[in-house]
Amino acid sequence: MATLEDKLLGEKLEYYCSSSEGEDNGDEGGDNKGASGKSRCSGLTIDTNPDATPAGGFRQQSSTNTGPKGVVKDWQRFKQLEAERRDETERQRLALAKKLTITATTSAEDEERKRQEELDAELDELMSEDFLQQYQKQRMAEMLRQTGHHQQFGQVQQLTSHEEFLACVEQENKHTTIIIHIYERQLAACATLNKCLDSLASDYPSIKFAKICSSVAGMSRDFRTKGLPALLVYKAQAVIGNFVRLTDDLSDDFFASDVESFLIEHGIIVDRALYN
């Protein structure tokens, strides 16, 4: 009958390592054990190679932590990537907006420059001499219409009495310029001036020209010899011009154009070229 030890040994015989058996095969086993990397113990083969694949065909490998901490870490990484994408999108949006702004600004500057060039061209045209003269004529004609210069005279009126002299001045429109020549028949300069005034009366029909003999006007003998020819200019019953002995300015030999220039220079009449 087998003993308890035999039973135990018999049941574990497959896993039992005999020391004597290892000693008998020591010389042979030394070479085999080094070559195969395996050791045998009473029929039990133990593979000591750490890289060997288990019999079931599976091999244990390390894996990412999928616990709560791993989930939090993954979520944080996701939010980080999402924030980076937002930053990149914002940078691209700002770059595009800047580009569009530059383009829009350039277009606006071009339009402003073009508008300024057009204004400069118009200003140059307005400042041209021809335009200014035309504008001055139109403005002068408008002013003459507004001040009652629509009245037409066209010739020199002969005043034969002191009363006519007063009526000529006091009964005229306040906007009308009245030029009265005080003359003496025997003076050649007075005769020349009368002819010049006849011509100017035709050229300036809105101005009232008149003449009166110095004796009729009540002038003294001394004035008749030293002050003639003389011009008195009235407007709104007030004297605005008093010119005596015109030969001092015009000389003894003068023409209608000389008288015209003299009156224009002193502001008595306005050059007809401005409103004709």
UniProtKB/Swiss-Prot annotation:
Q: Which residues form the Phosducin domain?
A: 62-272
Which Pfam families does the record associate with it?
Answer: Phosducin
Q: Per the UniProt entry, what are the Gene Ontology biological process annotations, in alphabetical order?
A: chaperone-mediated protein folding; regulation of G protein-coupled receptor signaling pathway
Give the start-end ranges of region Thioredoxin fold: 153-276
Listed A to Z, the keywords are: Chaperone, Phosphoprotein
Q: Where is this region: Disordered?
A: 18-74
What SUPFAM superfamilies does UniProt report for this protein, alphabetically?
A: Thioredoxin-like
**Protein family according to the UniProt entry:** Belongs to the phosducin family.
Full protein name: Phosducin-like protein 1
